[in-house]
């Protein structure tokens, strides 16, 4: 179960619905992937986990390495570059390549978003569709838009038979 900003950290609403659903199916195992703002919320559950919840994984949207000094260099190979193009330019996205790239332990979101390859793909998008606005504004907007995506792709996502997203 993928829960954005709610279960098991907030009482009521969507969280209440998720908790009721999990309890209604005790014969099924559930793993929670909770997307939360930052590590300050980690483990502060408002619900007691039912026995059929085997794990809670957390993904943090404000967990970025921007401030760790000098940016590491990253150079994408051709397949990774095309996958990045596909997601930014709206082509048929090569999710397998993006997941593989982002799941590497040494992968740096900072290095990707501040790197040459990201810059060139954004520049291509800008020239094709958005050249009427200031490029620096566009570049930083694109970094802000894609940061949450790459944070989630960098998170260890548990294997499951079915993924259900609620928000």
Per-region residue spans from a language model:
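Short, flexible loop segments at the rims of nucleotide/cofactor-binding pockets, characterized by
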Residues: 8-10, 140-143, 162-163
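Short N-terminal targeting/anchoring amphipathic segment
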Residues: 88-91, 154-166
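Long, low-complexity, polar/charged, intrinsically disordered or flexibly structured peripheral segments
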Residues: 91-156
